[in-house]
Amino acid sequence: MSTQSRILILNGPNLNLLGLREPAHYGSQNLEQIVNALTIQATALNVELEHLQSNREYELIEAIHNAYQRIDFIIINPAAFTHTSVALRDALLGVDIPFIEVHLSNVHAREPFRHHSYLSDKAVGVICGLGADGYEFALKAAVKRLRSN
């Protein structure tokens, strides 16, 4: 691990529409605002932050593969891929990088098909229903874990 920890933030499909799409579920902040706030927080915590949002499953998988031996922790909001992607699960398990799963909305208070996650049983933790604050809590938790190891 480098002297400065590196954390990768991954955001899945339709999160590029934050601020426009169903604000009652996802809030009014757009993704750029969320990432900017996280970047400020990461700087204050003395960690490097990388970010990728993609609507394409393979791009998220490639980012996970490229994180191997380069990234210390992943924070992922897989969005709709949460409920469908064995491939994302396998990629995360393959690189053996600890990760936290984040969801803006409380997926358990929504449609039944959103209740299952292919990732949560392998995640260090899951944060859902706290809006954009969930990312900030995940970043703090990731840094705390990295510093305690």
UniProtKB/Swiss-Prot annotation:
It comes from the Bacteria. The active site is at Y26, H103. The record marks R21 as: Transition state stabilizer. It is an enzyme of class 4 (lyase). Signal peptide: none annotated. Disulfide bonds: none annotated. It holds the Pfam family DHquinase_II. Its EC number is 4.2.1.10. Pathway: Metabolic intermediate biosynthesis; chorismate biosynthesis; chorismate from D-erythrose 4-phosphate and phosphoenolpyruvate: step 3/7. GO terms for biological process: amino acid biosynthetic process; aromatic amino acid family biosynthetic process; chorismate biosynthetic process; quinate catabolic process. InterPro entries: DHquinase_II, DHquinase_II_CS, DHquinase_II_sf. It catalyses: 3-dehydroquinate = 3-dehydroshikimate + H2O. One of its GO terms (molecular function) is 3-dehydroquinate dehydratase activity. Substrate binds at N77, H83, D90, L104, S105, R114. Keywords: Amino-acid biosynthesis, Aromatic amino acid biosynthesis, Lyase. Homododecamer. Catalyzes a trans-dehydration via an enolate intermediate. Belongs to the type-II 3-dehydroquinase family. NCBIfam families: aroQ, PRK05395.1-1, PRK05395.1-2, PRK05395.1-3, PRK05395.1-4. This is 3-dehydroquinate dehydratase. It comes from Aliivibrio salmonicida (strain LFI1238) (Vibrio salmonicida (strain LFI1238)). The lineage of its organism: Bacteria, Pseudomonadati, Pseudomonadota, Gammaproteobacteria, Vibrionales. The gene is aroQ.
